[in-house]
Amino acid sequence: MLETLRERLLSVQQDFTSGLKTLSDKSREAKAKNKPRTVPCLPKYSAGLELLSRYEDTWAALHRRAKECASAGERVDSEVVMLSAHWEKKQASLRDLQQQLQQLPGLIADLESLTASLTHLEASFEEVENHLLNLEDLCGQCELERHKHMQSQQLENYKKNKRKELETFKAELDAEHSQKVLEMEQTQQLKLKERQKFFEEAFQQDMEQYLSTGYLQIAERREPMGSMSSMEVNVDMLEQMDLMDISDQEALDVFLNSGGEENTLLSPISGPEASPGQDAVTLQVPTPSQAPATPPSSSSPGTDPASRDPSEGGESPVVQSDEEGVEVDTALATLHSDDSDS
């Protein structure tokens, strides 16, 4: 478009210059025709000079105006080029807008479908959220059940361990108790044997002294021994007894022959603890008239030798204890009888 405009401007300029040339030529021909041929005239140089100067001025003005028109045409051409580019941009924008406007119904349909899809997705999201909440509740319940199961297992293991410890402790206590009971029984048996041996030795010494001297009288009393098998007992019962005269040798022989029975009689007396509630223990040696029929026996507590009948013999020997009484321990007597049986 600009090229055609330039070509037109150039053609107009050429036409203008050619028209000026033709006009100058025609004016020259007209002047030549107006001259009379017959009458010769002299050339007027001043008029030609003026005409030439006028033509030069006109040509210079035309040339200047042509340059101005060319510069204006160039400016118009640049503006037209810019306008054409701007128009092309606007045309492209209009085409794009037209295409977008043509696509607008499809876009609206897509938006409607997207809206429906979003609604469906919202419902799906709500359902998934509800399922997730249910799943979270189930996970919490499972975790709680697992924790309860672990706690119950720990409780069962704790109970088992405590039961095992209790059984072990019971077994240890039973073993310790049985061992202590066995040791106590052994020590008690040893103490009882020692006491029995001690009483037998004391009895033997007293009997030897009695056989050698004929009487047994103890001037001083011994203090009670310390505790044996958790009991305080009076020792040397025979040393605390006063033996009176014997009437004849036959009664002594009968008394010596019945030593086994007296040992059985004295064995429960050696074990028990002396009790202040009893009055006395009296041992009577039989007379020759009573020797074949009556063995020596222990009188009941509270028997007074001064109250005996003098018809039985005023000289009958009597063994009387200085203690207030003797309390018989049935348990020790039983153990002593078991030892004597064995």
UniProtKB/Swiss-Prot annotation:
Keyword Coiled coil: yes
Phosphoserine found at: 11, 316, 321, 340
Membrane topology: Peripheral membrane protein
Bias type Low complexity, positions: 286-305
Covalent S-S links between cysteines: none
Entry GO CC: axon; axon cytoplasm; BLOC-1 complex; dendritic spine; endoplasmic reticulum membrane; endosome membrane; growth cone; melanosome membrane
Modifications made to the protein after synthesis: Ubiquitinated by TRIM32. Ubiquitination leads to DTNBP1 degradation.
GO biological process: actin cytoskeleton organization; anterograde axonal transport; anterograde synaptic vesicle transport; neuron projection development; neuron projection morphogenesis; platelet dense granule organization; positive regulation of gene expression; positive regulation of neurotransmitter secretion
Keyword Isomerase assigned: no
Residues spanned by motif Nuclear export signal: 243-256
Pfam families given in the database record: Dysbindin
Superkingdom of the source species: Eukaryota
Protein keywords: Cell membrane, Cell projection, Coiled coil, Cytoplasm, Cytoplasmic vesicle, Endoplasmic reticulum, Endosome, Membrane, Nucleus, Phosphoprotein, Synapse, Ubl conjugation
Coiled coil: 83-180
Record localization: Cytoplasm; Cytoplasmic vesicle membrane; Cytoplasmic vesicle, Secretory vesicle, Synaptic vesicle membrane; Endosome membrane
Region Disordered, annotated ranges: 263-342
Subunit architecture: Interacts (via its coiled coil domain) with KXD1. Interacts with CMYA5, PI4K2 and RNF151. Component of the biogenesis of lysosome-related organelles complex 1 (BLOC-1) composed of at least BLOC1S1, BLOC1S2, BLOC1S3, BLOC1S4, BLOC1S5, BLOC1S6, DTNBP1/BLOC1S7 and SNAPIN/BLOC1S8. Interacts directly in the complex with BLOC1S5, BLOC1S6 and SNAPIN/BLOC1S8. The BLOC-1 complex associates with the AP-3 protein complex and membrane protein cargos. This BLOC-1 complex also associates with the BLOC-2 complex in endosomes. Binds to DTNA and DTNB but may not be a physiological binding partner.
Family: Belongs to the dysbindin family.
Job of this protein: Component of the BLOC-1 complex, a complex that is required for normal biogenesis of lysosome-related organelles (LRO), such as platelet dense granules and melanosomes. In concert with the AP-3 complex, the BLOC-1 complex is required to target membrane protein cargos into vesicles assembled at cell bodies for delivery into neurites and nerve terminals. The BLOC-1 complex, in association with SNARE proteins, is also proposed to be involved in neurite extension. Associates with the BLOC-2 complex to facilitate the transport of TYRP1 independent of AP-3 function.
Protein name: Dysbindin
Organism: Bos taurus
GN (gene name): DTNBP1
